[in-house]
């Protein structure tokens, strides 16, 4: 069977949604691997008025843009509202989600099934993180840093620097 070449008409665009507060090496692992699977990957930062993020939307976007620069087929965007509506607006065919543990799976399965109910043509692709990041979350990174622990190797150097600036009161140059 001859190889099928993907044309722009059949572009496989995926959305990788999240709060990315802060961006971790686990997120970057999924971005790198997702960039190899999809023709285009849109890393989409959720604007959630109900959450009080550590980093502003602009700060998170800038950090993500700086970190995904090496990937030609990855771009950063923001959204609010229903993910399925946003995905359809962007003409995405898939949502990329990371699953670290059974607890993630239960939640993500529920979300994927609801998304399928709302938008049957939108697929959810679950990806396991590299083993080194299977326990890593933004919440843990913030807690470790707040308590004086090292986050080296858990987040990119840029993010570690921004955490220092946030927690120690020096102005960020974003």
Q: Model features per residue range: what roles?
A:
Residues 1-174:
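Nucleotidyltransferase catalytic core that binds NTPs
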